[in-house]
Amino acid sequence: MRLDLTQPDFKAAIPILKKIEAAGYEAYFVGGSVRDAILGLPIHDVDIASSAYPAEIKRIFKRTADTGIEHGTVMVLDHGTGYEVTTFRTESRYQDFRRPDHVTFVRSLAEDLKRRDFTINALAVRHDGTIIDLFDGLKDLQHHQLRAVGNPHERFHEDALRMMRAVRFESQLGFGIEPATKAAIADNAKLLVHISVERVAAEFNRLLTGIDRRAGLQDFIETRLFAYAPKMAAHETALTQFSQLPDTQLTSLASGWAALIFLLRTQPLVMLKAWKQSNELITLVTQTVKLLQVMPNPTAWDLYQAGEAAVTTASEVQKLLTPDFDQQQLAEAYAALPIHSKKELALTGADLIKAGVRPGPAMGKALNQIEQRVVAGALPNELKKLLPIATEMSQDRL
């Protein structure tokens, strides 16, 4: 079988493979780009593996950068876009269950491929498109199956993050996990505690937005990986409930986290801080969960306080929780608000001061009451109508 290499990212990198081969070494496309190209998915980073050692790559090409030379990776810059070329290697013991204690450069493609995580990621492609498949990766791609290369227990002891990658790929690609590989995840789930929260979160985030979220979550639960993830151990019931929701692919990470946290009935700040998520995500999920608590019939003030992003996110989550929920009606209700932020309010504190109102708590309270009444439609958003009412409310004149 040959892979069509006319995609721009591959096509642009073919001269690099040819130049390495012309110097007497082997060079192949490897990794996720090969897998995704075979599946007909968009490809992203193109990785190249070679029998040439780093010093030899640097002699072959005029412009290079040492991006990870201790692990055999050199960035080749000769052809515009940089391409990482990594020397074939074997790895020794993994005492921290994440990084090898020692890396040895080798000349054998087979030795390099057998250390990889799953068979679908252990394919190599020559510059003419010829596919090298030493571990039946093509067969597993055909059957939509995730299977560890060689002994799965060894693969997960080498790098415990691979277990999270398995459930992430299950969701992202819509693949199933081969029974022996799944059993090995269950046997080794406790090793996940050795992996940094950031790395675990990166995989879980991608699981939440995959095309088969249910399958990924179900195996996350069945293999007990969840028990070793931040703040998840006590929430098997809610996680199971989450995994049973319709498998509609979510459009945003915030929707996934908001749905999960709403079902967990836990504080968004506590959970998301434990998972080391961004402040931006924490704010949006917090606003969304607050709105979900008054759904499906929020007031105009609820919608106004939530803001457009949280309304959109809550709408998607509510549709997941209640399939007959009318998202269009919610969108129209938000769009129909007289104002959508305080900046749009016709009355300001400066207007009140100019009218003789003393700055202070009374003025702030009056402005807040005016804002709420305008949002509710009880008052028109017109300065000439709002100013006398707010002035009277303040009752604290100069």
From Swiss-Prot:
Record-linked Gene3D superfamilies: 1.10.246.80, 1.20.58.560, Beta Polymerase, domain 2, cca-adding enzyme, domain 2
The keyword Acyltransferase appears for this protein: no
Binding site for Mg(2+): D45, D47
Domain of life: Bacteria
BP GO annotations: RNA repair; tRNA 3'-terminal CCA addition
Subunit record text: Homodimer.
Protein family: Belongs to the tRNA nucleotidyltransferase/poly(A) polymerase family. Bacterial CCA-adding enzyme type 3 subfamily.
Name listed for the protein in its UniProt record: CCA-adding enzyme
Gene: cca
